[in-house]
């Protein structure tokens, strides 16, 4: 038997070496050809061989364990087994998830390794408005395109990109997506291994293994953090490592000082972790005073890096990205204004109990974490966890107050992912109770099983669990977050059940029998609609399957999927516009009905159109071709609101719109000088303030030039406007009562002809086109060769810091209120 094990071990070792060599070559080249065979190996795919390599490594470890080697499979030294097992599970779906939030972290390692900087200038596709109409994930600073998110995750991903950065791999290949996935999965798997080591110092091996499994597979660690380079993975690893150091520091005091490094890294990766770091730092100060200096010194390099990054990127060492700048708005914004306006009980109910985002719905085993949190406060309870508990509560309350508490388009309670290792550690005080009570033990195991299943749906069930966010964009229709019949947990199991029924009854389907498809529609929409250019049409359509074939919600290569679609017609001709789609959540059997909700954007050119809405069998036919008449609506698209040419026309317009004049936002547009030469950088300042009430508005900017020609700013250039008159400047802007906000833009003038120009700005109510304020300013573009005095370029961000002034006697207002995905 020993000889057989040795032979098997040798074969596995040889296989591992070959696979490792194969992976390294792919990472350097993006794929390679085998001479003589005429085939290409790899082809920008690296996940599959890595998955096999990990499986082989686990098999070798198991063979050594069975052969009686001195390696215990799930003993404390076997944290490597925990790491490899988690990594294998995270990669097993073989998929990459697209999210704009993670795009900077995907490409930053290439920029750091190839160019030695932190900008994204060399990736112009990230700035392409055709690919990314809303570029919330980047910003422009000091003349460069930079990430709008902390760079901690990108720094941890650097080792995975080294071969590709040194090799010939292009940025726009699938291999780079897979490198992001591999890095994210490895980071979270490491956090699971570190958590296991921490728990082994506190409880038994079996309890440590069960709690680690709950953390690794029953939280967003499986469904999100391990699938792409969000900030959460780096945050989880940093917090897990800090807790390990602090726990080990009880027996070996110098380990307490080491906690400063991972804790500081967690903060720069996810600045909200400061709410946990502060009480943990207080624990060190009070109970480990001799380690305070070492604790601070350990975190000093990370803090110094962040200050350097802020200074070189934004021109100010204390100018930070995204979330930390948003948290400063908590004390800046008065009640009822800005991004921290959700009533705390409403937000708390959402982050804990929402069918689409609730922590207790997707990871209900954390109820035992809450019990552990109570137990540590009794006499003799764990002193370290007493300090961690307020940080957990603070972060939950923080996100409960955010207006976007559901975290945009995501799966489950993504915003609370950072708390996962801390919540897992709070279970260990409950272990003695679980050991004594079989009922509680079974309840805990059942809740862990539910949690694993819930997050496995997000990780393994194709894209359908994610597509739920986009059918009716959840950011615009947050009421969908409270549906118990249509959510990311219910739809995939329902679809699986219906597919089982289809197989058992041998029903024809939309894929193999499209000739049997038929439907009846119902809609409460009027026969004719008038809508302004740029607005969206909300449509609810009920569809009943009156045919003999089942409608499929998933199918290989999408062929045979039944979806709701629409087409636009003008003068009897179909327009070359992208046909919209709304997806089914689950298969629909004959006799069943499904309610579709669609958000439809009309053509941008004003005029009369016909909108045709109906079901289609993807890649096969529209139902209308089989005799099911579609819903037809006559849609009149009007012009976007037109700004009055004269400023004195504004009060009359406001009066007609029934907006109280004394509550109208004050608005001004100004340029840094009145005359420019072609090629100069034009600086436009937009100043808004509110008095009497708070506003949340959309801003629209338009440049009128010589001969009445109109231009607009697309985020990078001033370009000629061909269709819609007004274009949005920002997704949403908050104007709190009594506050003033300034936005400064640097605009190139190279594309503009010589002549006189007028900038027009208007503010409208969010999700509507009712104008509430308007302003204008003029400038001259001259070809004169004489010098034109004035500002000639620089950093928008730095200028914001110096010029974001407030009304006299009023508190400072936050500079951003972007309500996009975070």
Language-model segments: residues:
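Transmembrane-helix signature of polytopic, membrane-embedded enzymes
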Residues: 167-174, 192-218, 237, 250-258
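Membrane-interface alpha helices of multi-pass inner-membrane proteins
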Residues: 109, 211-213, 242-245, 255-270, ...
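Hydrophobic, aromatic-rich transmembrane alpha-helices
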Residues: 2-3, 281-285, 361-383, 389, ...
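Signature aromatic-anchored transmembrane alpha helix within multi-pass, membrane-resident enzymes
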Residues: 73-83, 296-304, 384-393, 431-460
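Perimembrane helix-loop-helix junctions
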Residues: 275-308, 370-381
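Specific aromatic-rich, kink-prone transmembrane helix
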Residues: 194, 234-263, 422-426
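Transmembrane-helix motifs of polytopic, lipid-linked glycan transferases
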Residues: 179-203, 241-244
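Start-transfer (signal-anchor) and selected internal transmembrane alpha helices
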Residues: 1-18, 48-91, 200, 294-297, ...
